[in-house]
């Protein structure tokens, strides 16, 4: 048994060794796995913590980072990676305050940077950006490179900046393939920006300086649905004829606060739903302006100069729900009888506001829908008259209504029915026909550069079209100038004319209050301005006005010089008198006598409270208290005993019961104290 034991030991030792090795290997592999898992978990947690870290000056909420109204001069550098919307408005951030690592935030889609200190379009923006607000900054330029860095941009707000037409780089929007909304309100634009993206659906250019719109201004904008041009300098003559007709998908057009005399020609009719024309100078509307606008729901013509509307203007407006006509001088005559009937018939579906009569006098202040008996007089029967004649005149007027010239800036043609370009060799008689009987004009040259025009209309009119042309130089092509004159005016003064020149002046009635003018032939007259050196010039009139006007210029200058010299002499005399008086005063001060200064001091002390002022070698006493002293003071010196001191007490003048006491308790016998 002793021999077998070692054998057993030798046999079992290799097995134990193998088992221990396997156990150690397994333990080692498990430890490595655990270490790897722990490292990965730590890295993941670190990434999560970094992505959710919020800047200390901001507030974060599920991807929305609120850093607005903090007075920041730069964007915080530790913006979380999961941020989707950055609110950075109402700060003082400039272009240098936009960090470069902002473009690495690939989840950011909306940035609000309005009301900051940006003077250039920011470039360090994430490519994922879809909406950018830059209102109320000082951005001056729009470069193609800046927009190319954010190709996914859909909405760009640049209101209230300093962008001008020349500061927009050519093809600046060439890489903005997804831009749908562009706001450029309240900038310095003088024309429509070129190269706008074809994907644009909403364009706002209100409150700029746009005065002209050429034919190609909106070329290719087939997706445009909303166009706002309020508060510009637009007039009919500076808008090309087919400017808006190409915008077939337009649903809203706003031309508020411009200088339109009539609605623009060829408005888009297929899908237009809202048309805003208020706050212009519109005095007439052609009968076919709103033709085929079957989708129109809202029409605003408030704050214009309309007195009447042509029959059938609203015939195609089957979906019209709101019609605003406030603040117009409506003349509720027979020509508006059709409108009264239309308002009553559509009262259930159309909300009409502001159709208040301003004339005739008997219906002033009444709503047109409430007028019955006055308009029923238009139906008086008679042979070939009554309703038939009134209807015939009204119908004829619809087709003969004047159209404000539009597009003449680009076509260089004057569209004036019945008015040819004047020729200096042709005489211009007064117009004939029914239209000529309603208007008579008289012209008179006042000065070398002005002509006065007066006229008389037999029927009240909403407006007159006045045109004039200088003759004698180029009969075939003349520079015709025209303007619209309100119907209540009876005279007009032409100024800034050429001296000794012949002018042909024509006037036509746009619309009368009771019936339209069937014949639009203008009434014309000639006038010749005076010679610039003739007796009718303003200068000669002023010279002949009175005797003072004939004084030579040298006499006027001499009189002015004499007047100035007189003032100088008087000033010298006043100065001399002043100096002499001061010397006399000083002499008297020297010769006052030999009284001593102590006398002045003593008398001043005894009589009243005074101050001493030293002037020259003597003393002068100036009283400052006009009241008499209430009691005289006698000064006594009190010698206190050894070891005692004087106590101080307040003394009031006029109260004799107040006494002072020494430390020994013995009262003083005097009423004054030291």
Curated annotation (Swiss-Prot):
It is found in: Cell membrane; Endoplasmic reticulum membrane; Cytoplasmic vesicle membrane; Cytoplasm, Perinuclear region. LRR repeats lie at residues 82-103, 107-127, 128-149, 152-173, 178-199, 200-220, 223-246, 249-269, 271-292, 295-316. Residues 49-552 are extracellular. Glycans are attached at residues 249, 305. It holds the Pfam family LRRNT. N-glycosylated. GO terms for biological process: cell adhesion; dendrite development; fibroblast growth factor receptor signaling pathway; neuron projection extension; positive regulation of synapse assembly. Residues 328-380 form the LRRCT domain. One of its GO terms (cellular component) is perinuclear region of cytoplasm. One of its GO terms (molecular function) is fibroblast growth factor receptor binding. The keyword Phosphoprotein applies. Disulfide bonds join 54-60, 58-67, 332-357. This is Leucine-rich repeat transmembrane protein FLRT1.
């Amino acid at each position: 048994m002793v021999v077998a034991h070692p054998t057993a030991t030798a046999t079992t030792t290799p097995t134990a060794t193998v088992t221990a090795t396997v156990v150690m290997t397994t333990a080692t592999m498990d430890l490595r796995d655990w270490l790897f898992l722990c490292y990965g978990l730590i890295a993941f947690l670190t990434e999560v913590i970094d992505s959710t870290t919020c800047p200390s000056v901001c507030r974060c909420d599920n991807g929305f980072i609120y850093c607005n109204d903090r007075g920041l001069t730069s964007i915080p550098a530790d913006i979380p990676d999961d941020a989707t919307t950055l609110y950075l408005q109402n700060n003082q951030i400039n272009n240098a305050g936009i960090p470069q690592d902002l473009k690495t935030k690939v989840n950011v889609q909306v940035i609000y940077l309005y009301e900051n200190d940006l003077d250039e379009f920011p470039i360090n923006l994430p490519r994922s950006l879809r909406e950018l607000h830059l209102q109320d900054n000082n951005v001056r330029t729009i470069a193609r490179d800046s927009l190319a860095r954010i190709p996914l941009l859909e909405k760009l707000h640049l209101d209230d900046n300093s962008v001008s037409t020349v500061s927009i780089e050519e093809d600046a929007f060439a890489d903005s393939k997804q831009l749908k909304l562009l706001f450029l309100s309240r900038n310095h634009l003088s024309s429509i920006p070129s190269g706008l993206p074809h994907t644009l659906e909403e364009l706002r250019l209100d409150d700029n300086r746009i005065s002209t719109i050429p034919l190609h201004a909106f070329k290719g904008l087939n997706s445009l649905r909303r166009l706002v041009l309020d508060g510009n300098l637009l007039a009919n003559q500076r808008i090309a004829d087919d400017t808006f007709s190409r915008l077939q998908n337009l649903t809203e057009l706003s031309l508020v606060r411009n200088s339109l005399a009539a609605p623009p020609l060829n408005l888009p009719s297929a899908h237009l739903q809202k048309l805003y024309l208020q706050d212009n100078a519109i005095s007439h509307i052609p009968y076919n302006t709103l033709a085929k606008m079957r989708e129109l729901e809202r029409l605003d013509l408030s704050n214009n100069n309309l007195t009447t509307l042509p029959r059938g203007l609203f015939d195609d407006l089957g979906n019209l729900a709101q019609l605003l006509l406030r603040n117009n001088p409506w003349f509720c005559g027979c020509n508006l009888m059709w409108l009264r009937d239309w308002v009553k018939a559509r009262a259930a579906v159309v909300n009409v506001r502001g159709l208040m009569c301003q004339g005739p006098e008997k219906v002033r202040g009444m709503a047109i829908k409430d007028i019955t008996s006055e308009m029923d007089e238009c139906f008086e029967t008679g042979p070939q008259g009554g309703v038939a004649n009134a209807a015939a005149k009204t119908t004829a007027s619809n087709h003969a209504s004047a159209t404000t010239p539009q597009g003449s800036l680009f076509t260089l043609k004057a569209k004036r029915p019945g008015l040819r370009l004047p020729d200096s060799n042709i005489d211009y008689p007064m117009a004939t026909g029914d239209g000529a009987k309603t208007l008579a004009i008289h012209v008179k040259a006042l000065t070398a550069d002005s002509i006065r025009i007066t006229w008389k209309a037999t029927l009240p009119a909403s407006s007159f079209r006045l045109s004039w042309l200088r003759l004698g130089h180029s009969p075939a092509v003349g520079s015709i100038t025209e303007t619209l004159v309100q119907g209540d005016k009876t005279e007009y003064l032409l100024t800034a004319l050429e001296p000794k020149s012949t002018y042909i002046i024509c006037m036509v009635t746009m619309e009368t209050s009771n019936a339209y003018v069937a014949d639009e032939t203008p009434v014309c007259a000639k006038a010749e301005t005076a010679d610039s050196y003739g007796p009718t010039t303003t200068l000669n009139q002023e010279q002949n006005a009175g005797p003072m006007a004939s004084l030579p210029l040298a006499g006027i200058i001499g009189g002015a010089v004499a007047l100035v010299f007189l003032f100088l002499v008087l000033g010298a005399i006043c100065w001399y008198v002043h100096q002499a008086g001061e010397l006399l005063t000083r002499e008297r001060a020297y010769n006052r006598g030999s009284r001593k200064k102590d006398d002045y001091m003593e008398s001043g002390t005894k009589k009243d409270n005074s101050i001493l002022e030293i002037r020259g070698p003597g003393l002068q006493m100036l009283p400052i208290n006009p009241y008499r002293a209430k009691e005289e003071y006698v000064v006594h010196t009190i010698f206190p005993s050894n070891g005692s001191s004087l106590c101080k007490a307040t003394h009031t003048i006029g109260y004799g019961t107040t006494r002072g006491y020494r430390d020994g308790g013995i009262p003083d016998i005097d009423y004054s104290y030291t």
